[in-house]
């Protein structure tokens, strides 16, 4: 017997075992209690309710657009209106790591460290990269991209595959158009989303009056 960590990994296993009998794309909404071995603190609970929406079997960016629109619609229904959607792509982040000269096999470790930026700041990220023995030239090159906060979706195309930028811009434009500008979406190059199973588009929602993300 064990306590369920989240809803996403069991869904992946279910889909892998039953994909031939399921509709494609497979759309799921589920809600249940999940458990984490967390040190209890503000925003970190050992037991909480997870509401999950997933689209499996559709590799187009249309799935990402639908997920953002559905998420924000749900937030509107529970009374949250003053929020913004932050968006990035893990492939862009991987290309940034490569641009700095880091080895591909270190990407996950790098992502875990970089994901702490909101808590420890860019100087803290630099210090932790140094503590973990990463090459100083690579560290300096990486930190320089984020030091002044001026890395935009347009400028990041200079250090990553331009197709990733095009796809991300399409998502932003589509959400903006469908919502008639009611859903603010902004590119956030420092957005990581800690789980290792993220490989493409990632997003999270920040709302006024709440610390951390309220959805993602």
Write out the residue ranges for each language-model feature.
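Amphipathic alpha-helical segments within well-ordered protein domains
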Residues: 72, 94-98, 111, 126
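Residue-level "edge-of-site" marker
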Residues: 88, 110, 142
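Positively charged, Gly/Ser-enriched RNA/tRNA-binding surfaces
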Residues: 6-21, 28-81, 125-216
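Cytochrome P450
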Residues: 82-86
């Amino acid at each position: 017997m064990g306590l369920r960590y989240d809803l996403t990994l069991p869904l992946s296993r279910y889909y892998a075992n039953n994909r031939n009998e399921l509709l494609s794309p497979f759309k799921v909404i589920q809600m249940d209690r999940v458990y984490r071995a967390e040190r209890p603190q503000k925003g970190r609970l050992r037991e909480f309710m997870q509401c999950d929406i997933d689209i499996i079997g559709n590799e187009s960016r249309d799935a990402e657009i639908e997920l953002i629109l559905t998420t924000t619609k749900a937030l509107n229904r529970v009374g949250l209106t003053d929020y913004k959607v932050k968006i990035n792509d893990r492939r862009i982040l991987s290309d940034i790591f490569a641009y700095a000269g880091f080895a591909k096999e270190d990407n996950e470790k790098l992502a875990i460290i970089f994901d702490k930026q909101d808590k420890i700041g860019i100087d803290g990220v630099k210090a932790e990269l140094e503590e973990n023995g990463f090459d100083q030239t690579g560290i300096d090159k990486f930190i320089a991209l984020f030091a002044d906060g001026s890395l935009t979706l347009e400028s990041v195309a200079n250090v990553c595959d331009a197709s990733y930028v095009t796809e991300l811009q399409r998502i932003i434009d589509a959400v903006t158009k469908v919502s008639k500008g009611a859903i603010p979406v902004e590119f956030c190059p420092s957005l990581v989303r800690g789980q290792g199973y993220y490989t493409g588009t990632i997003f999270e929602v920040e709302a006024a009056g709440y610390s951390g993300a309220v959805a993602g």
